[in-house]
């Protein structure tokens, strides 16, 4: 392990995770403010996705350059914290910050309920009472899995193998 400990990794991951979450929060807020605009929603989605990928890869490269360690564990910490912040924001936005959003969701659900059988309608109505919690967990899982995939791809594409390291020599000695 290098001179940097777990405390350094987690403190850096917290700061970088907040910056990463800020992009998602800003883009989601824009879509909440302009709910009917498909173009605004699409642009916000594209900006959020591209900026998040670019930032995570940049943070991983910075961490690897600073510590000399494999940045995958740092990226997982960053993605975990960022996903938690985004999930809390989405739940708060639905429950308190944008109450009209919950009304729109409820209206869409009511329209789709008319096509459901009676037992399905009862389940959906009970589910709507817990929608902020459902949004929290679904956002957390979605963001964490997306971040995990991006981190894994970035880690495998940026990893440099040193052909002159001691491990390779030990393997050759064992084969001889």
Named regions from a protein language model:
Residues 111-131:
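Short membrane-interface loop/juxtamembrane segments of multi-pass integral membrane proteins
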Residues 88-115:
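Functional transmembrane-helix hotspots
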Residues 59-73:
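Membrane-helix interface/capping segments
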Residues 1-62:
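Transmembrane alpha-helical insertion/packing segments
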Residues 132-163:
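Transmembrane alpha-helical segments in integral membrane proteins
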Residues 23-31, 48-52, 82-90, 146, ...:
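Alpha-helical transmembrane segments of multipass membrane proteins
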């Amino acid at each position: 392990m290098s001179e940097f400990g777990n405390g350094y990794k987690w403190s850096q991951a917290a700061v970088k995770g907040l910056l990463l979450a800020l992009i998602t929060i800003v883009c989601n807020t824009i879509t909440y403010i302009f709910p009917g605009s498909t173009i605004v929603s699409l642009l916000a989605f594209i900006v959020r996705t591209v900026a998040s990928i670019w930032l995570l890869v940049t943070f991983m490269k910075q961490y690897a350059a600073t510590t000399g360690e494999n940045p995958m564990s740092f990226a997982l910490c960053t993605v975990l914290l960022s996903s938690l912040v985004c999930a809390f924001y989405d739940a708060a936005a639905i429950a308190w910050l944008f109450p009209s959003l919950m009304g729109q969701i409820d209206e869409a659900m009511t329209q789709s309920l008319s096509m459901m059988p009676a037992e399905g309608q009862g389940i959906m109505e009970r589910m709507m009472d817990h929608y902020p919690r459902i949004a929290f967990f679904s956002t957390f899982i979605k963001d964490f899995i997306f971040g995990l995939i991006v981190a894994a791809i970035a880690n495998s594409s940026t990893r440099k193998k040193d052909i002159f390291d001691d491990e390779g020599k030990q393997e050759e000695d064992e084969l001889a």
